């Protein structure tokens, strides 16, 4: 089976803050952008941050209040460990720290 890249657009309230978080703290390469949106290479997929309102609620999973909407990437063990340690070292305030299910 061939995995095909996906496009995911999410709302943000500040493009510069999104650029700092996704680009600098998470290390995603910035692609195209405009005044109201910016896209990033999310492990070969396209993550686009658009200025817009967010609707948020949570659902209990593994005893944690998991925000909805949310998204993630499935990594092998070594990639997960490396990425997890990298983002933990960037002083990010997590809603839920990276963990394995």
Residue ranges of model-derived segments:
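Amphipathic alpha-helical segments
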Residues: 14-29
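Conserved short beta-strand elements that form part of the metal-binding/catalytic scaffold
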Residues: 30-65
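Short, solvent-exposed beta-strand edge segments and adjacent coil->beta transition regions
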Residues: 3-7, 66-70
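Vicinal oxygen chelate
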Residues: 15-16, 71-101
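Alpha-helical scaffold elements within enzyme catalytic domains, especially in hydrolases
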Residues: 21, 39-41, 86
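Short secondary-structure junctions
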Residues: 27-32, 94-97
């Amino acid at each position: 089976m061939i995995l095909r890249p996906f496009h995911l657009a999410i709302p943000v309230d500040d493009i510069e803050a999104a650029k700092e978080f996704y680009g600098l703290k998470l290390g995603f390469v910035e692609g195209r952008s405009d005044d109201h949106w910016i896209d990033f290479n999310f492990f070969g997929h396209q993550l686009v941050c658009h200025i817009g309102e967010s609707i948020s609620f949570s659902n209990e999973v593994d005893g944690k209040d998991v925000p909805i909407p949310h998204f993630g990437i499935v990594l092998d063990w070594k990639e997960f460990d490396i990425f997890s340690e990298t983002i933990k070292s960037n002083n990010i305030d997590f809603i839920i720290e990276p963990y394995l299910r």
